[in-house]
Amino acid sequence: MAEGGSSEEELRAIVHNLGVSPFFLGTFDKRFPGFISSQRMACAIVNTAGRETGGVHWLAMAWNPRSKTFYMFDPFGFSDSKLKQVYSFEYEGLLRRSAIASSPDRCVTLAKSNETIQGPNSAACGLFCCMFLHAFVNWPDDPFDHNPTMGPLKSVPNYKLNDPTVQYVLWGNQEKLYKFLEKHSAYFRAHAAAIKARTAFNKLKQ
């Protein structure tokens, strides 16, 4: 992200603090080559745009080889068609490029977040991705919910993303996100004021 949002360096530092590093392949733009090993648990943070644009929106992707599940986490919970429409981003090709698609039985489960936890004008997508990856490495069989990291967040149907009546719920999620990072990330604590300013709930309106 350029003026608002999170830089790649920032996300890598926070991910390291959260204990994700042993499984973390890195931050990538939309040209992410996919997961290179079908036998190893792995994850990444991927932007929907090319690096040359400065970035647009962060997603998290993760692979659990035990259950053969490919997780795609989008804090907005956009549908496949909406991701393509809004960002011209398609993950099907990415999935095909991954080594996991060439596993012997080619039986891969795609699990995708389909509800919204982030406000429409928030620039905290990268931070939410870090939070999700913490859940993934600790509870790889159910990282979206039913765990102490993501469980406290409240989701709303994606079609209500801009509904004024749910903004307090989404604002509350961002406050919980900041508190989580304050507790678990030394990098976040050291740069909290600047990070909060760049990822503010109303940042895209400023």
UniProtKB/Swiss-Prot annotation:
InterPro entries recorded: Papain-like_cys_pep_sf, Peptidase_C5
Q: Where in the cell is it found?
A: Virion; Host nucleus
**Which Pfam family would be a valid example here?**
Peptidase_C5
Member of which family? Answer: Belongs to the peptidase C5 family.
Q: Where is this site: Cleavage?
A: G54, G55
Q: What is this protein called?
A: Protease
Report whether Hydrolase shows up as a keyword of the record: yes
Activity regulation as described: Requires DNA and protease cofactor for maximal activation. Inside nascent virions, becomes partially activated by binding to the viral DNA, allowing it to cleave the cofactor that binds to the protease and fully activates it. Actin, like the viral protease cofactor, seems to act as a cofactor in the cleavage of cytokeratin 18 and of actin itself.
Instruction: Could you list this entry's UniProt keywords, alphabetically sorted.
Output: Autocatalytic cleavage, Disulfide bond, DNA-binding, Host nucleus, Hydrolase, Late protein, Protease, Thiol protease, Virion
Q: EC class of this enzyme?
A: hydrolase
List, in alphabetical order, the GO biological process terms annotated in this UniProt record.
proteolysis
Q: Name one GO molecular function term.
A: cysteine-type endopeptidase activity
Recorded hits in SUPFAM superfamilies, A to Z, give: Cysteine proteinases
Question: What is known about its induction?
Answer: Expressed in the late phase of the viral replicative cycle.
What more is known? Answer: All late proteins expressed from the major late promoter are produced by alternative splicing and alternative polyadenylation of the same gene giving rise to non-overlapping ORFs. A leader sequence is present in the N-terminus of all these mRNAs and is recognized by the viral shutoff protein to provide expression although conventional translation via ribosome scanning from the cap has been shut off in the host cell.
> What is this protein for, i.e. what is its function?
Cleaves viral precursor proteins (pTP, pIIIa, pVI, pVII, pVIII, and pX) inside newly assembled particles giving rise to mature virions. Protease complexed to its cofactor slides along the viral DNA to specifically locate and cleave the viral precursors. Mature virions have a weakened organization compared to the unmature virions, thereby facilitating subsequent uncoating. Without maturation, the particle lacks infectivity and is unable to uncoat. Late in adenovirus infection, in the cytoplasm, may participate in the cytoskeleton destruction. Cleaves host cell cytoskeletal keratins K7 and K18.
Gene Ontology cellular-component terms for this entry are: host cell nucleus; virion component
**Which reaction(s) does its UniProt entry say it catalyses?**
Cleaves proteins of the adenovirus and its host cell at two consensus sites: -Yaa-Xaa-Gly-Gly-|-Xaa- and -Yaa-Xaa-Gly-Xaa-|-Gly- (in which Yaa is Met, Ile or Leu, and Xaa is any amino acid)
Q: Does the keyword DNA-binding apply?
A: yes
How it assembles, according to the record, is: Interacts with protease cofactor pVI-C; this interaction is necessary for protease activation.
Entry's EC annotation: 3.4.22.39
Q: Where are the active-site residues found?
A: H57, D74, C125
Q: Which domain of life is it from?
A: Viruses
